[in-house]
């Protein structure tokens, strides 16, 4: 791989360094996971066996979930948990609470992380999981502050402004000590290309493990192709297709937050529909699940 990288860098001056790095990351991950992702045809018997094993795992697990619990009972009952290779779209208009819901799910999954050692020295997640959170809109510091506020029940604006008393300060300090080692990894790089996002997710899985990816939000991820003639719809379609491919490759669920178009605001009935997905393209085709965040009280207050 090193010789190939050196040769390409020497002979192809047009190739951007970032693309070379992404290509090498892909090759390294493929080498580490040799045989686990591209296995070709499997017999129907093997597929049946795997499906029965999934059902057995759900039967043995508390709550009867075959996937990772979101921490929200009603949602888990509808989805049966979040399953490996699923692309889950969480969409809504601004101020509906998309990021708040996503951070709550991420925190719950990371907080419940349990694993067991395997005979070959690797670890297997038995509950919860390691979370990779790509926050393209909010900084890691802002995200952490939001989690601390949720965990302690102290309003976020009070923490930001420093208008807390000594007791609340102690609560915050104790909370930080309790949750600082959770397996929740935040990447707050803005305008991240989908190729770089995938490379970083592979690296995280290789170094720390990975059970859930969250992307906040879909429309802020950029195309890796940068072709002048591509429309924004084509770019977003490329992103969703690559996120679905990444979910299958890493065998983890991917939650991608998405904005909705302004058409929602012009209707009398503000409840979102699939057609409201902003720059939708192939979002609904690539997604396994599409969920909408809707708060009727928000519109009544206005």
Label every PLM stretch briefly.
Residues 1-61, 85, 96, 128-129, ...:
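Short, small/acidic-rich helices and loops at N termini and domain boundaries
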Residues 76, 118-123, 234-302:
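Phosphate-binding/switch region of NTP-binding enzymes
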Residues 92:
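The Walker A (P-loop) glycine that initiates the GxxxxGKT/S ATP-binding motif of P-loop NTPases
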Residues 77, 112-209, 223:
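Cytosolic-facing regulatory segments adjacent to core modules
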Residues 71-81:
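Pre-Walker A adenine-sensing motif
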Residues 88-89, 132:
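Short hydrophobic/aromatic beta-strand immediately N-terminal to the Walker A/P-loop
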Residues 101, 105, 143:
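Hydrophobic positions on the alpha1 helix immediately C-terminal to the Walker A/P-loop
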Residues 104-112:
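Walker A/P-loop NTP-binding motif
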């Amino acid at each position: 791989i090193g010789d190939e990288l050196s040769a390409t860098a020497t002979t192809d001056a047009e190739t951007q360094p970032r693309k070379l790095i992404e290509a090498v990351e892909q090759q390294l991950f493929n080498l580490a996971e040799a045989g686990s992702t591209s296995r070709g045809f499997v017999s129907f018997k093997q597929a049946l066996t795997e499906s029965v094993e999934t059902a057995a795992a759900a039967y043995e697990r508390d709550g009867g979930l075959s996937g990772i619990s979101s921490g929200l009972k009603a949602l888990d009952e509808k989805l049966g948990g979040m399953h490996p290779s699923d692309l889950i779209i969480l969409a809504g208009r601004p101020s509906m609470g998309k990021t708040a819901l996503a951070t709550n799910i991420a925190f719950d999954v990371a907080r419940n992380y349990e694993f067991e050692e395997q005979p070959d020295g690797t670890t297997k997640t038995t509950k919860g999981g390691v979370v990779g959170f790509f926050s393209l809109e909010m900084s890691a510091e802002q995200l952490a502050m939001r989690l601390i506020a949720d965990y302690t029940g102290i309003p976020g604006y009070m923490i930001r402004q420093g208008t807390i008393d000594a007791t609340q300060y102690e609560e915050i300090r104790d909370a930080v000590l309790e949750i600082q080692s959770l397996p929740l990894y935040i990447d707050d790089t803005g305008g991240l290309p989908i190729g770089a996002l995938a490379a970083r997710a592979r690296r995280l899985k290789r170094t720390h493990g990975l059970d859930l990816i969250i992307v906040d939000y879909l429309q802020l991820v950029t195309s890796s192709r940068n072709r002048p003639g591509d429309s924004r719809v084509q770019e977003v379609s490329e992103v969703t297709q690559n996120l679905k491919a990444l979910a299958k490759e890493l065998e983890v669920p991917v939650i991608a937050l998405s904005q909705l178009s302004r058409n929602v605001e012009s209707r009398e009935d503000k409840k979102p529909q699939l057609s409201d997905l902003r720059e939708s393209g192939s979002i609904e085709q690539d997604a396994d699940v599409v969920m909408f965040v809707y708060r009727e009280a928000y519109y009544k207050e206005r």
